[in-house]
Amino acid sequence: MRNFSANFVCALILVAAASGCDTLKARSVAKEAADLYHEGKLDEAIAKYEEAAKFDPNIATIQLNLGFANLAAYQQDPKGKNGDLAANRAVEAFESFLKLKPEDERGKQYLVQTFVDTARYDAAVQYFQPQVQKNDPEALNTLGIIASKTGKFAEAKDWYTKRVAADPNNADAHVALGVLVWDFLHNHKEVVAQQRKDLADEGIKVLLDAIKLTPKAPNPYTYTNLLYRERSEADITDDEKRPDLEKANEYFKKAMELQKAAK
């Protein structure tokens, strides 16, 4: 029995020693990768980071730097086959980093930015699916941002609407949806007539809800003003435009008053 215990302890020591050696080797190889990255040798740097990760997959900074290196490789060839592969690997690396450091905000920011930069909207939806199923407002908001920045207005509007439903007393959720609608109308003059009015009315409604929640915040008034101006463009004559422009001026003045009062 004593021999068994002694052998077991020795085995544990050997495993710990081997693990320690792997960690040291991983850090050494990662150092080589960093040098190659700074020399602009991206493919070699990526290969070295991958080698380092094999020695010790639990070093978060290696996964983070592997993500950066792959993102840089994607940016060199965004429309090519190699760029597509690098984008997928960047997402995988940042996801691995987040598994090791789930509370690190940098990882979340880098992953979201990678989804945006590489136009991987579907991958983002898949990644955030567990949180979406829980109706998590932050996940819904993040997907709204990604959809918006990848040119998917309808999807962004849907995510922001779901965020409002999930967190109805959050004025920022209402404002985000209103701003999205204003931005779309402002940049899509081809949306005309009743379609333009209906969409503007949707944005105005959620902004008025935001005003009810935070009556002293200037932003909802500012964007209500802007949406009334976009709405007025659906009309042709000055007489038709006048009611919307008068409303716009009313909310603009209120926004200015609140901004001055806040100083």
Predicted segments, located by residue:
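Canonical positions in the second alpha-helix
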Residues: E51-A52, S96-F97, P130-Q131, K162-R163, ...
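Position-specific recognition of the canonical hydrophobic site in helix A of tetratricopeptide repeat
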Residues: Y37-H38, L71, N82, V116, ...
